[in-house]
Design a protein with these regions (language model features):
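Residues on the lipid-exposed face of transmembrane beta-strands in outer-membrane beta-barrel proteins
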Residues: 31-35, 51-57, 71-75, 117-121, ...
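Short amphipathic alpha-helix initiation/capping segments at coil-to-helix junctions
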Residues: 198-206, 213
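Hydrophobic core residues within well-ordered beta-strands of beta-rich domains
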Residues: 27, 49, 81, 115, ...
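Short glycine/proline- and aromatic-enriched beta-strand/turn motifs that initiate or cap beta-hairpins
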Residues: 21-68
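Predominantly the C-terminal beta-signal and adjacent terminal strand-loop region
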Residues: 166, 208, 212-257
């Protein structure tokens, strides 16, 4: 679906509004499937098992529903305003998932984690629920650098058991973070047969998408999303980027608790 068409549909859907931004803040847990690119900018796609989890307590929280699998502590600063610290899972980049990386003998970036801080604001503008989330993350491996993201989401539709929302997100990275994913050292250049490339700091990627859920009963629901992501900044010009835009989708069965 082209971007203008998706935006027109989102605007039309504002007539009946969902109850909560990011569909809900209900506690839930369950299994899911995700279809995604091998890495942002890859032509190869892969399907993987992912958790569907959300528990927003005080002080503890854990969730996978805001684009990152994260857990930590948070505190309430005011009505609808929370600040916290988190540990997050960082998926890395595996050459075996990408025909391009494998054919050029590019090394893996191992799965890792990060430490960070976040601020989140939930508010209703009339009947429209909105969530704004800002996060900063520093990889455990100092060579993997720092990232910051800003995410906005809103509920836009509810009819019977079906709810939907939209979201947009932008991610910035310092030079180490961008270069670790998209840079090519002179040594790697010789092995891979690709030109050496050094990526700098700045905007890394932007994305927008659709969130949806279907209630199956008081305790069970199906949740999912559709996402379109674009590689930006220095990363966009890397020889490792086969496509500047990627699509992903996920769906899962969750139990409310």
């Amino acid at each position: 679906m082209k971007t203008p068409t998706l935006l027109r549909l989102a605007c039309l859907a504002l007539l009946p509004l969902a109850a909560q931004a990011e569909l809900s803040n209900d506690s839930m847990i369950g299994p899911g499937l995700r279809w995604r690119p091998a890495y942002d900018g890859a032509a190869s796609q892969k399907t993987e098992l992912v958790p569907v989890i959300r528990y927003l307590g005080l002080p503890w929280f854990v969730r996978s529903t805001q684009g990152v699998l994260e857990a930590g502590v948070r505190t309430e600063l005011g009505t609808g305003l929370h600040a916290g610290a988190q540990i997050a899972y960082e998926p890395g980049r595996l050459s075996g998932d990408s025909d391009f990386l494998r054919s050029h003998n590019m090394p893996d970036l191992k799965r890792s984690g990060s430490l960070g801080l976040q601020v989140e604001w939930d508010h209703k503008f009339g009947p429209v629920p909105v969530t704004l989330l800002a996060r900063g993350r520093k990889h455990f491996d100092s060579a993997r650098g720092l990232q910051m993201d800003l995410r906005a989401s809103a509920g836009v539709f509810q009819s019977g058991p079906v709810s939907a929302g939209v979201f947009g997100q932008a991610v910035w990275a310092n030079g180490r973070a961008t270069n670790s994913y998209y840079g090519i050292t002179p040594t790697q250049s010789v092995v891979a047969g690709l030109p050496a490339y050094e990526a700098g700091s700045g905007l890394l990627n932007t994305s927008f998408g659709l969130l949806w859920s279907v209630d199956l009963g008081p305790k069970w629901l199906v949740v999912g999303n559709l996402e379109r992501r674009q590689v930006r900044g220095d990363a966009r010009n890397s020889p490792l980027v086969e496509r500047t835009s990627n699509n992903s989708a996920s769906a899962g069965l969750a139990y409310r608790f």
